[in-house]
Amino acid sequence: TLTFGGGDDDEPLPDTRSGARRLALQALYWELASPGQLEDALRQRATAANMGTSNVEFAGQLARVCIEHGTELHDLITAAATNWHPDRIARLDGLILRLALTELLYIEGVPAKVTIHEAIELAKSYGGDKSHAFVNGILDAITRQRGLQL
């Protein structure tokens, strides 16, 4: 069984888009720790949560696109985090930012305001005390820079 740092693994993932984002975050965390395990992580956590097909597919799409555009996402975050060296960004904060940017830039049909709110909630659940403010600040800077509608 996979365990996930920073949150309560026994807490069930809801069969919602929010739950799908949490699933994608957890799978990405495991992909960092054990490269090549993304699909197993997605399958295992989705099965444990009894998550519906459409939300599992959404989580998988988010995670795969996030990995596919990892370098570009890292560069965007690094450029926006003007007072932070990339090595100082907590692993989970970085993953939450990458996941949100994936949704903002590559997944159609989700309002930017919803994506940012969801990222802040993930940061509150899994990040440190100030993670939500950091995530909000970086996403705000990038959405303004990119001219994305909120």
Named regions from a protein language model:
Residues 1-126, 130-150:
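N-terminal interaction/assembly modules
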